[in-house]
């Protein structure tokens, strides 16, 4: 096989494989739980949403609910750990939100990032903007949460996801 024949075959194959090489798992569920709630015990408490709850969350947040079941853990001493996914530009971003006992955001962690660009959303300073936000916060990109150039869709969708999870807390978790 000549070099040109090899290049003719290898180039299309590499184009198919290349996008997947940008996917990165930064944290497992256990690692994210320890990062957000160090030294705390967490108990799985998945929530299956009733149609009325799903509709109420969508109305309260203005964000579509993609799944009827939400992966949730109750934190000893109060608080919640919620695992979620949003679509970045083309691929899913898996992230976790830690909520304090009062329902305010304690911390968010980006666990899996599969997009080619926009990984800057993992930056601690960007993620820290969510701390203290509640369901009463407006959570608008470019107003409450600063955008990152080159990561606009990832920023917008994480912001929308957190807003949806805060509404989820109010409707499905708060007692």
Task: Identify the function of each model-found stretch.
Residues 1-9:
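Bacterial N-terminal signal peptides that target proteins for export
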Residues 9-18:
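Bacterial N-terminal signal peptides
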Residues 21-148, 152-156, 160-175:
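Flexible, solvent-exposed loop/hinge segments and secondary-structure transition points
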């Amino acid at each position: 096989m000549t070099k040109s024949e090899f290049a003719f075959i290898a180039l299309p194959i590499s184009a198919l494989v290349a996008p997947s090489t940008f996917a990165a798992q930064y944290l497992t569920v256990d690692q994210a739980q320890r990062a957000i709630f160090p030294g705390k015990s967490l108990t799985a408490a998945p929530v299956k949403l009733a149609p009325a709850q799903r509709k109420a969350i969508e109305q309260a947040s203005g964000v579509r609910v993609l799944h009827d079941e939400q992966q949730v853990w109750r934190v000893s001493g109060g608080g919640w750990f919620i695992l979620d996914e949003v679509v970045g530009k083309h691929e899913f971003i898996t992230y976790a939100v830690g909520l304090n006992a009062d329902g305010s955001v304690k911390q968010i962690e980006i666990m899996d990032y599969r997009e080619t660009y926009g990984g800057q959303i993992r930056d601690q300073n960007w993620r820290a903007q969510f701390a203290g936000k509640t369901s009463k916060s407006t959570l608008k990109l470019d107003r409450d949460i600063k955008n990152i150039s080159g990561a606009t869709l990832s920023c917008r969708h994480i912001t929308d996801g957190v807003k949806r999870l805060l509404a989820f807390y109010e409707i499905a978790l708060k007692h």
